[in-house]
A protein has these predicted regions:
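C-terminal catalytic domains of large/alpha subunits in multi-subunit enzymes
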Residues: 2-80, 90-173
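Short beta-strand scaffold segments in enzyme catalytic cores
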Residues: 85-89
Length: 173
């Protein structure tokens, strides 16, 4: 599923559109959408739109960046929570990527009992996702996966982690 946000960006750029506005337009104007299977809770498009807009605002979306720097935006609906992330990155002359900052805005509804724990959970999720993005690779030889355990599966290192992961929780019911 990590490929989906990239496809949104590719489609937006091919259409000459801003990736944020492209996503907002795709969400449409409805406030809720019923579940596709007829069961479960409806999808609250308004809440998704709100986290996207808030993440963009807090990350300075649309403000100029120096040469070699850029921003990307993505959103996710998971476990009845609405999450938007903006990553600010630098690409060196050698083509090496460094994630400078990630801004996350989430609407999980309800009261957060342990704010520090919730922030740490989101920050850990960002680190895990970046590790998957930067290092995840399974090699297959002779029809079998070469890596036999996590010891052979590289994880992100502290030096590769962004120095800033800003987490913001929207107050909703």
């Amino acid at each position: 599923h990590e490929a989906v946000p990239q496809k949104f960006d590719e489609l937006a750029h091919a259409a000459g559109r801003d990736p944020l506005q492209f996503r907002l337009d795709l969400l449409g104007q409805q406030d809720t959408v019923p579940p596709s299977d007829g069961r479960g809770a409806p999808y609250h498009v308004g809440r998704m739109r709100a986290v996207l807009q808030e993440a963009a605002k807090r990350a300075g979306w649309g403000t100029p960046l120096p040469k070699g720097r850029g921003r990307g935006i993505a959103f996710q609906f998971s476990h009845r929570g609405y999450v938007a992330q903006v990553a600010e990155v630098t690409v060196s002359r050698e083509g090496e990527l460094k994630v400078d900052r990630v801004t996350v805005v989430t609407d999980i509804g309800g009261q957060i009992v342990n704010l520090s724990g919730a922030e740490n959970q989101v920050q850990g999720s960002v680190i895990d996702a970046l590790g998957t993005l930067m290092h995840a690779q399974l090699d297959i030889e002779g029809g079998r996966i070469v890596q036999s355990n996590f010891g052979e599966y590289p994880l992100i290192r502290l030096a590769e982690s962004p120095p800033r992961i800003d987490v913001h929780f929207m107050k909703t019911d």
